[in-house]
Amino acid sequence: MWTPPRNDQHYLNWQWYSSILSSHAAMCGCPDAVAHFNHLASVLRAPQNPPPPGPQRNLPLRRLPALPAAPEAPGDRAPWPMAGGAEGEDGGAGGDADHGGAAGGPEDADLLDAVAAAETLLEIPAKKPTPRAIESLEAYKSLTRNTTHRNSHSIPGTSDVVSLARKLFRECNNNQQLLTFFQQATRDPGGTPRCTTPAKKGSKKKAYFSPQSSSSDESPRGKTRSRRKAGRKAQRKRHRPSPSSSSSSCSNSESWESNSDSSSTKSKKSNKIKISTLPCYQGGGI
């Protein structure tokens, strides 16, 4: 359904005129906008209408002006690399080079090498090995395990971690032996541990007995002890120890024999011989 416009022609003209005044007041400070508009209309010509369409006209082409010649200095001008030397300036060998003739100069070889190097840089190298799609979980696990870094040590036990662990284990053993020694020393303050130099190769270790020895009887254990005692005596004669150690060992053996003879007559019960397990250290000091 058609409805008449809300604003009539007079109101539209008034809006257009007020917009012209507002735009003039925004850009110019003169009091008369109409006189300003008439002055511009007289100075500036109205835009011409485009020419009517007609047959296509062949307009003449304008030639570009020639550029001024550059000042030339003697000896500063270098020959064109593709012209084949100084003759290219006159058009002799230069024409042949432009039409595909071989110049044969060192500059041409350098230029060709530079072009080949630039083309090589533009090429994208292929990846080796060629990547392939992972289709299953098993393939992913196999690729991951194959690319892991293995231990680079060829001989086991030569790494820094293993050597440090061994040193720590040795120090712990030494500390444990010292702790055991001090505990036994506190329990038996009267007893003094005996330490001697290690025996030679091929010889048996000597067994040290505590001052308080027990009795023995004619049981099988007593027989084995007597055999051990005879072996110790023979071993002492072979190695010939120092007078101090021999006297102490002899006194210990005699006391052990006297105690064993006296205790055998009193009772038939056998007691174990207490062997000191104190560690032996060298170097004169703990």
UniProtKB/Swiss-Prot annotation:
- Kindly give the Pfam families that the UniProt entry links to this protein: DUF755, TT_ORF2-like
Question: Keywords assigned by UniProt?
Answer: Phosphoprotein
Processing after translation: Phosphorylated at C-terminal serines.
Highest taxon of source: Viruses
What span is annotated as the signal peptide, if there is one? none
Q: Which InterPro entries match?
A: DUF755, HEV_TT_vir_Orf2/Gyrovir_Vp2_N
The residue ranges flagged as biased composition, category Basic residues, are 222-241
Which Cys pairs are S-S linked? none
Q: Region Disordered: which residues?
A: 67-108, 183-286
Segments of skewed composition (Low complexity): 242-265
Name of the protein in its database record: Probable protein VP2
Q: Which organism is it from?
A: Torque teno virus (strain VT416) (TTV)
